Amino acid sequence: MENEIREKGFSGFSGNQLKIFAIIAMTMDHLASTIWPGYGKEWWLLCIHLIGRLAAPTMWFMIAEGYHYTRNFRKYLQRLFIFAVLAHFAYNFCFGISLIPFRDSVLNQTSVIWPLFLSAIGLYIYDDEKRSFPLKNWQKTAILLVLCLLAFPSDWSCFPVLCTLHIYQNRGNLRKQVLGMVAYISMYVIVWCLCIDVVYGLIQFGIIIVWPFMHFYNGTRGKGRWMKWFFYVFYVSHLVLCGILRLILHSNVTTIVGG
């Protein structure tokens, strides 16, 4: 089937194209949370949130790929950190969460860019070839636990750190990459079902829809070097716009768990 598709001129998805898909899915999901806050059970609303599950695993995958291909890890990490800081204010404004962490909750206290930043550090810690200093296995594990702890209060909690590392360590084995992500997210689903909402907890399994997109990833960055900046700029900007829309529609009301 794949060969037939490629013979018809389809060369697969570039990294930039995957980012566009993630942007679309993410925007749909965030707009839905802004316009229809809470956990509505209308089928069309659930479908929107299900499509939105494509965004996070695509980000994890692209962090792993970006780390693999980057020629300057320090600049790569600096870019992630800068936008993690900017995205914190945009994310919390978007969903009506206090800008001061842990003021009202320990969940969803900052955006997913923060654990993505920590994920990149985790990749470096476990990369014996690129890392400039030696580490024993127990030291790697200890650092990973610290990274997970730091990521815990974020959107998607510590799972971006764990899933990104799993994706990178199994690079080239798509089946293992995806099934490993699903295994990790199973723990996230359990927490959702027990503490928040069963239906929306089960929707988190929707990350599996990333499988065909990863399958047809062609390993290229794609046209437009500006995309490495556009994704982060768009991420921050769309959150600010969603926050303004939230104020217009619902006044100063929190629209997700964490506020």
Enumerate the language-model features and the residues they cover.
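Alpha-helical transmembrane segments and their immediate juxtamembrane cytosolic regions
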Residues: 1-259
